[in-house]
């Protein structure tokens, strides 16, 4: 699959499903001109803004994420890096693992997140996927009773 908009749509729907299963209420902004793709509200009413990314698994077992936005218009192709105040988290969907990773929007965002062991079995300074499966703790399970039916 190569169409960028289709990948973005798949990523967004997978993140919405993941957030719902984790007890968040996902909300989509009315305007596509916001620097974030959706808002996640936890069981306490706290809202987090998320920028969704679709990132495929590389052969070496990592997901690389580009923390910038790209667009094209009649003046050419443009690239702009996100700023810290635009949203709270990146929600990165990896289709090969059918997994969503949540990375805090900060200056020290990992550029690569690893799913498989390194070739040299190094573990120091490796950013493992399992450390990015939760979004800011665990909210109350808003839909837990509904899901058990």
Regions found by a protein language model. Give the residues of each.
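Mixed-charge (Asp/Glu-Lys/Arg
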Residues: 1-34, 39-149
């Amino acid at each position: 699959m190569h169409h960028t908009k289709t990948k973005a749509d798949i990523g967004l729907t997978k993140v919405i499903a993941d957030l719902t299963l984790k007890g968040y209420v996902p909300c989509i902004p009315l305007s596509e001109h916001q620097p974030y793709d959706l808002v996640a509200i936890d069981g306490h009413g706290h809202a987090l803004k998320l920028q969704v990314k679709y990132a495929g698994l590389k052969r070496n077992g990592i997901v690389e994420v580009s923390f910038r936005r790209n667009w094209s218009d009649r003046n050419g192709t443009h690239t702009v890096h996100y700023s810290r105040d635009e949203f709270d988290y990146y929600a990165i969907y990896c289709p090969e693992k059918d997994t969503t990773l949540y990375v805090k929007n900060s200056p020290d965002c990992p550029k690569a997140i690893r799913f498989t062991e390194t070739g040299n079995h190094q573990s120091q300074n490796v950013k493992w996927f399992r450390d990015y499966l939760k979004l800011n703790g665990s909210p109350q399970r808003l839909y837990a009773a509904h899901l058990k039916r």
